[in-house]
């Protein structure tokens, strides 16, 4: 059962129409999880409440995904592919570049 905490920085640019549901559906597909087993908790953080040492680059609004999952793939390659699929799914749903999606697993 995957559980994801998704934090959007500077979130007003992302349409909120059923965003948590769209993320849950996309993550379920990306992870190959059975229907009804992927949970998402969505957080929005104002860009003023986010910082990087030395200052965040202009226009960079990251998305952080903290992912708990039982039964990760056994090989490093398969796990990497799974994490890439998660980042790509979140980027697509949120309309952010995949390079700005950070998956913590």
Language-model regions: role of each:
Residues 1-105:
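A domain-level signal for the structural core that forms small-molecule/cofactor-binding pockets
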């Amino acid at each position: 059962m995957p559980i994801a905490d998704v934090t959007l920085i500077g979130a007003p640019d992302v349409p909120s129409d059923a965003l948590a549901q769209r993320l849950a559906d996309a993550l379920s597909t990306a992870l190959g999880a059975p229907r009804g087993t992927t949970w998402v908790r969505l957080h929005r953080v104002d860009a003023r409440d986010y910082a990087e040492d030395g200052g965040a680059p202009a226009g960079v609004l990251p998305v952080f995904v903290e992912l708990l999952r039982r039964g990760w793939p056994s090989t490093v390659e398969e796990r990497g592919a799974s994490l890439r699929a998660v980042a790509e799914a979140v980027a697509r749903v949120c309309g952010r570049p995949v390079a700005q999606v950070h998956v913590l697993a």
